[in-house]
Amino acid sequence: MGRLFPLTMLLLACAAGGCLSSDAPTPKSWMVESSVQGEDTAPQVEGGGTAFGTTRVGSVSVDAPYDKPPFVVRRADGTVAFDHYNVFAANPSSLLRVPVRNRLVSDSRFNCVVQQSSVASVDSQVEVQVTDLSLDCRTAGRRVARAAVTLDVVKTGRGPRGVAFEGTGTGEADASDGNYTRAFSEAVDTAVGGALKALKSVEHAPAAK
């Protein structure tokens, strides 16, 4: 019994000092916000009018493995890791909707961008596909937030719905200062702006007779 006393005291001391604590660090939650640097990226519309009339943001889809809150970290050995201590404040598909909408508002080709819940009739709907939303740590000493986005403008008037315009853009921002809200906000804003600049008409094959 006497031999167990020192061990018991050692365990109590370790517990008091925190070295046996099982409590994990509290995760830090980060946002993706509308960038203050966002500006009109639209090419001049012929005749000075708008190209898309009234629109709304439709579905926002995020490819795996970027579709969950934990950051996806790209590593130098080609693998990815999931950072459970730096996470997005919500699922990325929900978090990106407002920044994308606000970017469309700043694009002169859209006459009006209504809220998702609006009952207003729209001429088009913008579908969003995110194919990259990662923290790139492949270069020693560097952390870079990356984003890649494809926008499909779907006409919603009479007749069959189809993709009328499509564009893809990428963005990156230095994240070495650890401010991931700023870094991912800038990367996403650049990617969406690039996709808007790249919008091109989608040619559809004529229906078979």
State the predicted function of each range.
Residues M1-C19:
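Sec-dependent bacterial lipoprotein signal peptides
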Residues R101, V105-R109, L135, L196-H204:
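Sec-exported extracytoplasmic/periplasmic mature domains
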Residues N86-D107:
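Structured, soluble extracytoplasmic/luminal domains of envelope-associated proteins
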Residues V57, V100, V128, V149-L151, ...:
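Buried hydrophobic packing residues in well-ordered domains
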Residues C19-S93, E203-K209:
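A structural "domain/chain start" motif
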Residues V60-V62, A76-G78, T131-L133, T150-T156, ...:
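Solvent-exposed coil/turn segments that connect beta secondary-structure elements
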Residues T79-V87, G157-K197:
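Short secondary-structure boundary motifs at beta->alpha junctions and helix caps
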